[in-house]
Amino acid sequence: RKGGVFSFFEIEGKAAHSGGNFEAGVSAIEELARKVQALHAITDLKRGITVNVGLVSGGQSVNTVAPYATGQIDLRYVERPDRDEAMGRIHEVIGRSFVPGTRAKLTIRG
């Protein structure tokens, strides 16, 4: 039977009008998209490790560079050392800014 860790991450960017002031914005949704790709790359099926970002949310309107975004992560593992390794990699991904000017926070839920 696999163990699991559920976590939640929040990303802050900077809002700007997407038509008139696009370059002043910092997209939290772009950051989220890049983090999702990096998080899913942690999956190692041969070792029984899976990382799934199953819920995402973000933005405030279609014509605004997204100032915030969130995601929820489900980590599954077989061996305890694999959990520790995967969690370390998850912390690295969340701690890294792929889009300059964004910040992210990870909260473990269980």
Regions found by a protein language model. Name each.
Residues V5-G110:
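Metal-dependent amide/peptide-bond hydrolase catalytic core
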Residues R1-K2:
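Acidic/histidine-rich catalytic neighborhood of metal-dependent amide-processing enzymes
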